[in-house]
């Protein structure tokens, strides 16, 4: 994901033999990778969302949900255990910390985005039984807690999510039950509700 630090990118990866805590950052300007401090809790199928350096909580990367077990190469791998854990990376301090509160819904393969005011929105994903979720949660760093918002119209996992120019949140495609979808939805942040958008 873009961290807006010299147009760098960060990623978390599996070493092919199991879970790893390694976090690498790619410096676009130099064309080089380098390591930063590792994630506190190794897991796969997590989502990342970053805040802009100039924002209220600038220079943070959220590592959201994920799974502790199963086959990270398979969307429906057996033995997977979803988690509600959320960790936050401080870019300036090169340090990972827990948010202090887990999400109310453990999930993997979810969508996660941050808005200009530094707040985190998490939606969808799947639980430990590979059931797709509609649930949406909101994290406000000022109080350090999650709160539930209106659920998506349809549950989905492993989908694209982004913030539109007007601040609304859009989700695109993903997996619904046992099939993939091209459907899209938009969350009206001010109105607090979802609506269907044209399919991709």
Can you say where each PLM-predicted feature lies in the sequence?
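Kelch-like beta-propeller repeat domains
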Residues: 1-200
């Amino acid at each position: 994901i873009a961290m807006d630090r010299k147009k760098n990118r960060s990623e978390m990866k599996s070493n092919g033999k199991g879970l790893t805590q390694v976090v690498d950052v790619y410096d676009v300007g130099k064309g080089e990778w380098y390591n930063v401090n590792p994630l506190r809790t190794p897991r796969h199928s997590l989502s990342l969302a970053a805040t802009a350096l100039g924002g209220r909580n600038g220079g943070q990367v959220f590592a959201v949900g994920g799974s502790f077990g199963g086959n990270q190469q398979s969307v429906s791998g057996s033995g997977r255990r979803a988690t509600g854990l959320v960790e936050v990376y401080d870019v300036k301090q090169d340090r990972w910390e827990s948010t202090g509160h887990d999400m109310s819904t453990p999930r993997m393969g979810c969508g996660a985005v941050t808005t200009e005011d530094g707040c985190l929105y998490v939606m969808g994903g799947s639980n430990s039984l590979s059931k797709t979720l509609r649930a949406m949660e909101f994290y406000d760093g000022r109080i350090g807690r999650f709160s539930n918002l209106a659920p998506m119209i349809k549950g989905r996992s492993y989908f694209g999510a982004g913030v539109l120019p007007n601040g609304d949140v859009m989700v695109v495609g993903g997996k619904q039950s046992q099939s993939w979808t091209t459907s899209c939805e938009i969350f009206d942040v001010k109105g607090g509700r979802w609506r269907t958008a044209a399919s991709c």
